[in-house]
Amino acid sequence: MNTQIIAIANQKGGVGKTTTCANLGIGLAQAGKKVLLIDSDPQGSLTISLGNPQPDKLPFTLSDAMGRILMDEPLKPGEGILHHPEGVDLMPADIQLSGMEVSLVNAMSRETILRQYLNTLKGQYSHILIDCQPSLGMLTVNALAAANRVIIPVQSEYLPAKGLEQLLSTVSKVKRQINPKLQIDGILLTMVDNRTNFAKEIAALLRETYGSKIKVFGTEIPHSVRAKEISAEGKSIFAHDPNGKVAEGYKNLTQEVIKLEKQREKSRAGLSR
């Protein structure tokens, strides 16, 4: 099985990374894909949003898995992976992960510890989605070193130019030095309030500024109070409000991501002839 590893990254917090990771993951599962979600944020937002309100009480989290790799200790198959009723698996995170980030600074092959862990799981999943922490620290670098694709959620309420440039520069550095397979799938506009001209202007400006170099997804995720309610419920927007506009947005994004994969496969097949 050719596993697609997608990092959901933006060093700014509050842009919809966790929501996108959970709902795109569950959207892919509904489309028949075998999906693992990785929470690589010590705050454990993805872990909490998928029904684990106390990540610190979980017996095994990502920091334990990465610790085993660091210490060259064996991992049992699927150890610590939780199953969510909507058809995805989850490797949870807790605050111990911030200690792991400190340990990585002096470790050998420090940028590839997460990649080495994911290599033990690759054949079991068609898709692995990584929810990155809101920083460009060692955990995010590990996620980018492990991924072959990046999706960048951007909130449509402000112009993200400076932060976006930093992220793009980090992605190109990781691609150049560590992971030549890394590609940007696109920029995803989130929390879009189409009632305001400002949101439309930001969207137009993003497409104008980056559209020639980087795809800006045709799908935009609308702003919704209902979407904000679900993080306490432990379920996706598809289970919470299946006919709402946010569920429709994530359904469309899922189709766009699958279409992109098919296009890439086609062009790879064409090149290899």
What do these predicted regions represent?
Residues 1-273:
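P-loop NTP-binding core
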